Amino acid sequence: MDKQEAKHINMPSPSACEHKSVEAYLFIDPLCKDCWEIEPFIIKLWLEYGKYFSIRHIVTGKVDGTNASSHKWNKPANIRFVWEKTTSLQGFSCDGKVHMQEASSTPYLVSMAIKAAELQGRKAGSKFLRKLQEYIFLENVSNPDCELLLACAKDSNIDVEEFKKDLHSASAKKAFQCDLKFTNEMHITEIPSLVFFHANSDEEGIKIAGNYSYDVYVQLLKELVKCEIEPEPLPPLEVLLEATQFISSKEVAFIYDCPQQEIERELKKLQLKRKVQMIEVKCERYWKWIAKEKDLV
């Protein structure tokens, strides 16, 4: 979710602390499940502390091998490594190098698609990414093709014709190359990785690699903001559902820190009011926000 979307979920007004004093960068591979599983943490952090930081997704996928010579950067990163852990990652090399692959390959095409969607705005890019991850991890789509990417564009309500034009455009390619360069400069060796920088300071950044408890992310944010910060009240359940459009009971329970059984009672009330539709996927319950009667499909 970005700043534009946040206004629909009652984000708080600025306090005595400097507004948006921290910049956060989430390094992801859209084909990695760990990057899908960190999203509820990011949503909760944004809802509670979003007035203190901005966030941007950085894609760490594969680059077209025809331009390999232009992707060798060795600029030192002004960053403090807080945690590094090794895990078995899906489709990502952890040797710190930018690897090359044919432009027709799935990782490259998917990365270009995310950048193409982002050309319509950060909110559009985030919606497209979430929809793409739903296809990959909930419907077991291991090799997203052009047809599926166009379906994601349509489902995320972005301009499909504009997306088609941008998918192989120089602008999308340049945006992806910038992400690869930034990934290399930050010495990202594990995904997901979250990097925090103070927006108005030359101090070193803080990087956390891998998935951790929510309190760890809050602790690091507080360390950079350097003043007392308190979480804002979470939005009403209906507002969250409308903003996310499609979310699991487990994710909602985590965000509101409530037992899943209690959350599902509230969700079923909304189902009776025909505001959400329950969809079972892989033994988990997901909830689709119904904007109009025709969405009941």
From Swiss-Prot:
Compartment annotation: Cytoplasm
Record keyword NADP present: no
Sorted UniProt keywords: Cytoplasm
Disulfide bonds: none
Matches recorded under Gene3D superfamilies: Glutaredoxin, putative protein disulfide isomerase domain
Domain of life: Bacteria
HAMAP family assigned to the protein according to its UniProt record, in alphabetical order: Adapter_SpxH
Family of this protein: Belongs to the SpxH family.
Protein name: ClpXP adapter protein SpxH
